[in-house]
Regions:
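Long, charge-rich boundary regions
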Residues: 70, 75-150
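A short, polar/charged loop/turn motif at coil->beta-strand junctions and beta-hairpin connectors
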Residues: 42-45, 99-102, 207-209
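Generic recognition of flexible, low-complexity loop/linker segments
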Residues: 58, 94-95, 202
């Protein structure tokens, strides 16, 4: 008997009367079952896409804004075999100790810096000069120049894509963002005189050639669990399929929690993932999702990876240190 029929037999007597005149095929019973569930749980709000718990929405969630991702590593040595190391070297507890210098981690570079996106989205108060300075400090030199020289419509379309031209939501945000940027470009009168976007950029002593480097991650889709979200983001941003990786089991995700320069509390949870050294990973500009999300991706040694992640991003640098410590002391058994 189909499970839908089983539930139909147990349902409320009032619904049985309705069922008497309905289609009793499997498709009809499925529809009936879904209606029963809808009526039984109509009082429960949807599941929060941020924390994964029922009873509230994202906007009503008190947990930090949470993303899920992966720290992807490999041993850049085709001759390395963990089983061989463990069986032939009695002093090895993990199979990694002598290969730590050959461990590499996959980092992705953001397409646009966080500060550039924050200013272009208009998520700031034009009178909050200190906050605006922080966003400018995080931009690349090229992004600063573009804010001064490229028409706003072009910047907006490049940031959001073609959907931004027709979406009412984007259209409303666009006009607010345009007005704020025009205020900044025109200059703001304060006690010390007039401050403009150009003057703030000129006095900035911090310079970056590329946007931030980090790990693939993203927000959870409705009804998606943590690991599924992390592996989906990995696939979308790096092109690596979940079938080609080994997720290290029996360890908690590596976490970074912090308050952003926008004063929002964030939490990023990363699963540790192993891939074979011969797996090709390249930036694919024909992959629209990859092109929209990232600017580059590359394998780095642990030391070079620490250098690539910006010094002020302490929490993300600690993720790499934690992973190195983990592989020195914990023995994940890798198998096909």
């Amino acid at each position: 008997m189909p499970k839908y029929a089983l539930y139909a037999k147990r349902m409320d007597p009032r619904l049985k009367e309705e069922a008497a005149s309905t289609d009793t095929s499997q498709k009809g019973l499925k529809t009936m079952y879904e209606e029963v569930v809808r009526r039984m749980f109509h009082f429960i709000k949807g599941t929060c896409t941020n924390c994964g718990l029922p009873g509230h929405s994202f906007r009503g969630c008190s947990a930090p804004v949470t993303s899920f991702g992966t720290v992807i590593f490999r041993v850049n040595d085709l001759s390395w075999n963990q089983a061989d190391v463990l069986t032939k070297n009695s002093s090895s507890y993990t199979g990694f100790e002598s290969y730590i210098p050959k461990l590499e981690v996959l980092l992705i570079q953001r397409r646009d810096s966080l500060g550039f996106v924050e200013i272009l989205r208009g998520k700031y108060n034009p009178l909050d000069i200190e906050y605006i300075k922080k966003q400018i400090q995080g931009m690349t030199d090229r992004e600063r120049e573009r804010l001064l020289t490229v028409p706003f419509d072009d910047l907006w379309s490049e940031l959001w894509g073609v959907d931004s031209r027709t979406s009412a939501h984007y259209r409303n945000d666009k006009e607010i963002s345009r007005q704020k940027l025009q205020i900044l470009q025109g200059g703001i009168d304060i006690n010390e005189g007039k401050i403009s976007l150009e003057s703030l950029i000129k006095e900035c002593a911090v310079h970056w050639n590329t946007p931030e480097w980090g790990f693939p991650k993203g927000r959870r889709d409705p009804h998606e669990n943590d690991l599924a979200c992390a592996l989906r983001e990995m696939s979308e941003e790096t092109g690596i399929k979940k079938e080609n990786v080994i997720v290290i089991q029996n360890i908690e995700p590596l976490c970074e929690t912090f308050y952003g320069s926008n004063h929002v509390h964030y939490c990023h949870k990363y699963y540790t993932v192993f891939v074979k050294s011969n797996l090709e990973v390249t930036y694919d500009d024909t992959n629209l999702h990859m092109k929209r999300e990232i600017g580059n991706l590359q394998w780095f040694s642990l030391e070079d990876g620490l250098q690539k992640i910006r010094a002020d991003n302490i929490e993300k640098r600690e993720i790499l240190v934690k992973m190195t410590t983990l592989l020195r002391s914990f023995c994940p058994i890798l198998h096909e």
